[in-house]
Amino acid sequence: MLEIDENMGITVYTTAPDEKSAEEIAKQVVEAKLAACCNFWPVRTIYSWEGKMKDDTEHVIFIKTSKKKFKDLEKYIVKNHPYSMPAIVSLPWDDSHEPYKN
């Protein structure tokens, strides 16, 4: 069985409807020590929702944290996110610059 290092760095990907929401989420998760750092920026998103094609602007948020904090971070995002079904995707740091990881 694969052993998972709970201290492994991960980046959690989510989106927010606007800059203000992205900034609030970023500040709150860093303040709550659920993340070390967040980055966010605007993107154009094309998707299907409730049978209709949508073309919107939203903000991607990269949340840098550790594997052991993921479940608490996920709960926080679900509870406080303006979307009813936010994207919450964990991207493991399989390889990264060693000094940055620490």
Task: For every predicted segment, state its role.
Residues 1-102:
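Positively charged, small/polar-rich N-terminal and surface patches that mediate targeting and assembly
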